[in-house]
Swiss-Prot record:
Superkingdom as given in the UniProt entry: Bacteria
Coiled-coil stretches noted in the UniProt entry, renumbered to this chain: none
Enzyme type, top EC level: isomerase
GO BP annotation list: L-tryptophan biosynthetic process
Signal peptide annotation: none
Protein name: N-(5'-phosphoribosyl)anthranilate isomerase
Organismal lineage: Bacteria, Bacillati, Bacillota, Bacilli, Bacillales
Amino acid sequence: MKVKICGITDMETAKRACEYGADALGFVFAESKRKITPGLAKEIIQELPANVLKIGVFVNESVEVIQKITENCGLTHVQLHGGEDNHQIRRLNIPSIKSLGVTSESDMKNAQGYETDYILFDSPKEKFHGGNGKAFPWELLAHMPKELREKTILAGGLNTLNIEEAIRTVRPYMVDVSSGVETEGKKDVEKIKQFIIKAKECSK
């Protein structure tokens, strides 16, 4: 099971997450309490292992700005949380992830229409897109076609207490956590460690 830790804002957390086995780190460039500047993101990314995915999170940003930040920071993928369509995705010409809020089983069919490398299924948006700490009914994704499952990233309210059930129900390619590994709004490296251990153990 691949694991993504999202909302990275400091070097120490990024390095520890990689040491514990994180496969991907997320850097939020959209409005969020976890927003990071491109300059700081670049400093952190330059120190990370080559095999770890560096994913930039954007919401309804222009193609030109996304391309500039991707190039300057050394991102490997972009994660799109707004109303981006296939025309914009093709113009980006960057490995991409489309985030969709899940409210019904029909969202799986909608997901198959996007020309992205991965689909991230998340809880419906609230004030900010993603990172709200709320789970959605995972059984809505239980009967996913194999070709979609192989590119699915599961997010939304995941933590060390529910990650095993979430993986058993959805069987995604990757799981994505942000608030579920925080204490009082800050990333907690011990929670990150335990989350990664549980996610990887229950998928063996």
